[in-house]
Amino acid sequence: MSSEQSDCWICQSLSRDPHLVYYETKTSLAKLNPDQLFQGYTFLTLKQHREHLHLLPENMRKQFLDDMLTVATALAKALNPDRLNYELLGNAQAHLHWHIIPRYISDPMWGRPIWAGNRPRRRLASEDYSRLKDTIQAHLPHPRTRKKTPLATQR
């Protein structure tokens, strides 16, 4: 199976918005959702185009799940949400990626799935994305694996 599929918008998104990337391993890439209505909302994407978790080779599956737990733990420590939601769907685009969504009692969708109906959007200024990434990165292990982005290196 090819590691990238030209018609997959998730494969294409791996190289977009490098300023939102805050963690990378050989298996996964973590980046902030541009919509930060839920502070810290992260996509953790498998770098290879694969569609089914249960069909991944064991070492890749373990690393992908470990990466998800590493990112979720960092989000919990950095942002202290009331809950963390984890979603691995594949209905809209069949490419393995986690939605890791910190939830707060004060959020406008509290008690409901974030997909329920229309919801407001929240874009941040570039310096606010950078601050948020720094806050999360402070709780990630192995600084040598952190992805340096052009925005982070300009400081």
Regions found by a protein language model. Give the residues of each.
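HIT superfamily nucleotide-processing domains
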Residues: 1-155
